[in-house]
């Protein structure tokens, strides 16, 4: 079975495909998650060895600091899965909502995208439509920011923090930074700061293939 772009669709559940790809990789791969952690939790349930086979597990999820009690969409959508994944032994690198939200795209970026190739023009049109329908001047780039942790820390800086996972808020998975040594806390490489101008330039230069005009 093929999709509209000519790519072959794999009929297996996502968890089975991920397990096979990781186990067959010649070098430890980076596993990236930019949505609810349901599939990753299923992978770890079916094949606990995967936690030790990946170079890192990069996740966009969680919220620290002000507003943390509200939680964050990706973890809240499947709190049980989030508990399994964040409590695992996988080498997690976490890009949190409170840091990744600082990088945005807005109307100026729409025009730059539309001035590039057909694919970028399409992206610019979609961004413009989203901003108009949401009635907002800009939108945060949560996922692209978090995914830079898979490459380097040129844009998003992280530190190993002590994180509590078992905050009792029904229907949510809330994480909290706690003092070192608190029982039940886990150590996790977590985002703490972002270089917004550098990330924005990197994203737009990469997508359009050209540096910003002066």
Model-found features: residue ranges?
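Generic signal for short, ordered secondary-structure residues
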Residues: 1, 64-65, 126, 182
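Short glycine/proline- and acidic residue-enriched helix-loop micro-motifs
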Residues: 1-6, 130-134
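Active-site histidine-anchored catalytic micro-motif
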Residues: 2-102, 107
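Conformational coupling and interaction surfaces
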Residues: 76-80, 88, 95-214
